[in-house]
């Protein structure tokens, strides 16, 4: 490969049975003409930051903790598609996205979120740097869905444009609650109103990226 520099973590292992380490790599540096740069481990709250920890926290719904680890919120990107439009009937319209294949999703529940419209098929250029605030539900929507299909629905605050067919990025900031089945649409509407206020309080705080 004729590499000039080889950058590895301090616990780097390679080769058969992972017997090679940083010292092994350095022992070949002069022969093959490269320099070894070792990156120290990063820690957060006395825990080493790693892809394993990040995946674990996401799978447990702790999306807030991974923001400083990733340097950004964990996000989902996809095209806005037509749904059942039940949200609109209760006064809380949502932008629906299809799940991405091989994407790690947090557990079913409601999340405070930020939204960016990346590009549009019908309205021309969008500003990908403009951020909207909202609330996102991930799950099978048990109150109105009897098929158990995974859904991703986002209510964008103070937003009434038609964005069907456009590509959006949804950034998950914090889990508000787990998914729950309600006895009626009125109960769902009341809970969503509370969730929206909770999301607004969460999003009013500064999102820390260390």
Predicted feature residues:
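Classical nucleotidyltransferase
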Residues: 1-93, 183-189, 196
């Amino acid at each position: 490969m004729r590499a000039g520099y080889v950058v590895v973590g301090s616990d780097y292992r390679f080769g058969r049975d992972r017997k090679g380490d940083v010292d092994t790599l350095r022992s070949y540096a002069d022969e093959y003409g490269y320099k070894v740069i070792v990156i120290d481990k990063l820690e957060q709250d006395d825990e080493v930051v790693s892809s394993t920890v990040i995946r674990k926290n996401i799978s447990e719904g702790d999306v807030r903790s991974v923001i400083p680890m990733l340097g950004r919120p964990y996000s989902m990107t996809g095209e806005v598609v037509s749904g059942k439009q039940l949200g609109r009937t209760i006064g809380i319209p949502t932008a629906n996205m299809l799940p991405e294949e091989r994407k790690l999703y947090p557990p079913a529940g409601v999340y405070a979120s930020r939204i960016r419209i990346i590009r549009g098929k019908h309205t021309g250029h969008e500003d990908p740097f403009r951020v909207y605030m909202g609330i996102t539900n991930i799950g099978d929507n048990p109150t109105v869905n009897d098929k158990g299909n995974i859904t991703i629905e986002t209510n964008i605050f103070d937003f009434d444009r038609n964005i069907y067919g456009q590509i959006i990025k949804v950034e998950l900031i914090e889990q508000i609650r787990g998914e729950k089945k309600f006895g009626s649409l009125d109960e769902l509407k009341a809970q969503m109103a509370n969730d929206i206020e909770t999301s607004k309080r969460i999003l009013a705080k500064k999102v820390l990226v260390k």
